[in-house]
């Protein structure tokens, strides 16, 4: 017999922890650049009965019966994704960005082939060739990095390495890079050496959808993304590609990498894509960028050094070496003050990955709450105060109180706390 109790009755321990996490999100400043807050509609889809349905295969071609409804759900997600990004084909089944990237690699290359990608140490991602990741284990990775003069991507180096190594894939994208990615220039290099260009736009997908960052879709064989971050959907992945690659890519996801898709997550993706197709989403993305620029200037006014001097998108990297702080110390101190960031490697970082010399800061979540430039100036000052006295418990307590007061003016998930 099916249990009929609500969560609070059936499992009070988990219910309590969920309330505590919701309260943490509501009462603190969420500045992790890869995090965001989904809408109640997205949450509702995630918790729907679609979680019960197995649906191996694709709409109209399933290995299970009873898929007539989830076929419609998934097709809506596909159609909305294609409309949002102007793509020929979309696969909305990847459970995460890592699976999307794996499928892209497997569709275009064989193990042992050469991949030219941005080094994790300079802002890339684990799946762009880190030796501890499948990408670094299966492929020959040639990393590119930044110019020391301005801490932006060294396109001359990218071109030189491409000509020297003739990669099968040129992987473009980053997880900690605050400047515009010039996909047209990358495409010229890829075309010159006969490489297939793959773009991981996970961090900037929302900006791309709103036309605030150049789109990689016209220039790339394959584009991968997560569906959270700036896109403000559920945690998951997606692949966009030219029609010529559609069949191969689909087969790499299923049956190649995954089994049954998570149709409740796909429904939530469809809801988020629908939200992103509305005019107000563009205004939201404009606010993200404006907030990031104001926050960056505020942090510099507080005496902090930013990698590359600022930001063009939703995030910035703070170099803490002039403060004689590590990212680990800064993350912990800010956390005690109710400000959540993540420690992050900076270019040419002398510290280990679990220590780091920097922190990564982003504005998507605070922008979702409705905060604007005025609040960003205040947030920058609060961060500055904490980093000036990271071991002073009185300072941290005072800042935490101010953070809680600020958040109270921008309530979130009030019915769930």
Curated annotation (Swiss-Prot):
Kindly state a single biological-process term from the GO annotations of this entry: tetrahydrofolate interconversion
InterPro entries hit by this protein = PyrdxlP-dep_Trfase, PyrdxlP-dep_Trfase_major, PyrdxlP-dep_Trfase_small, Ser_HO-MeTrfase, Ser_HO-MeTrfase-like, Ser_HO-MeTrfase_PLP_BS, SHMT-like_dom
Q: Which domain of life is it from?
A: Bacteria
Q: Name one GO molecular function term.
A: glycine hydroxymethyltransferase activity
Q: Reaction catalysed by this chain?
A: (6R)-5,10-methylene-5,6,7,8-tetrahydrofolate + glycine + H2O = (6S)-5,6,7,8-tetrahydrofolate + L-serine
Which cellular compartments is it found in? Answer: Cytoplasm
A cellular component term, taken from the record's GO annotations: cytosol
Q: Where is this site: Plays an important role in substrate specificity?
A: 228
The UniProt entry's coiled-coil ranges are none
The cofactor(s) it depends on are: pyridoxal 5'-phosphate
Give me the residues that bind (6S)-5,6,7,8-tetrahydrofolate, please.
120, 124-126
Enzyme Commission identifier(s): 2.1.2.1
Identify the main location.
Answer: cytoplasm
Spell out which residues are annotated as carrying N6-(pyridoxal phosphate)lysine: 229
Which keywords are on file for this protein?
Answer: Amino-acid biosynthesis, Cytoplasm, One-carbon metabolism, Pyridoxal phosphate, Transferase
Please name the pathway: One-carbon metabolism; tetrahydrofolate interconversion; Amino-acid biosynthesis; glycine biosynthesis; glycine from L-serine: step 1/1
Among PANTHER family, the record links this protein to:
SERINE HYDROXYMETHYLTRANSFERASE
HAMAP family assigned to the protein according to its UniProt record, in alphabetical order: SHMT (MF_00051)
Q: Which family does it belong to?
A: Belongs to the SHMT family.
Q: What exactly does this protein do?
A: Catalyzes the reversible interconversion of serine and glycine with tetrahydrofolate (THF) serving as the one-carbon carrier. This reaction serves as the major source of one-carbon groups required for the biosynthesis of purines, thymidylate, methionine, and other important biomolecules. Also exhibits THF-independent aldolase activity toward beta-hydroxyamino acids, producing glycine and aldehydes, via a retro-aldol mechanism.
| The protein's assembly and partners | Homodimer.
What name goes with this protein? Serine hydroxymethyltransferase
Q: Which organism is it from?
A: Anaeromyxobacter dehalogenans (strain 2CP-C)
